[in-house]
Amino acid sequence: MGKVMLFTDGAARGNPDGPGGYGAVLQFTDSTGTLHEKELSAGYVRTTNNRMELMAAIAGLEALNRPCEVELYSDSKYLTDAFNQGWIDKWVENNWKRKTGPVKNIDLWERLLRAKNPHRVKFCWVKGHAGHPLNERCDKLATSAADGDNLLVDEGVT
């Protein structure tokens, strides 16, 4: 099983009703020691920062063409705590309901679970805007996508 590092970030302008984007950087080193990288990003007309954080992780995992060991780095506690604190398991058990009502962004959580399924994923939180080079790079990809001209429609925004 190949080892991959996935760095992700999401951004939204005027959260929750403004444009947003995500950025992701995949890195892996092949058997010759050569580092390979792939950047992913997209922007949306109207979305939220949490949806873009999830989309960054989804895009990165969906870009993998075989099962991998993945270290996923995100500055989103919403994303990392859902897995590291076991929230996602409780949400699924309770049919996507919490004590305070339905879980938000069910469409993306379900898609993320499908994308994660063939891989072994470790979710790692990094402090945002604290000088971590790859987090900063993903932030730049996300904000550039949000500010771009070719914005997509986020069908899951209500």
Model-identified regions with their sequence ranges:
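RNase H catalytic domain
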Residues: A11-D17, I58-R137, A146
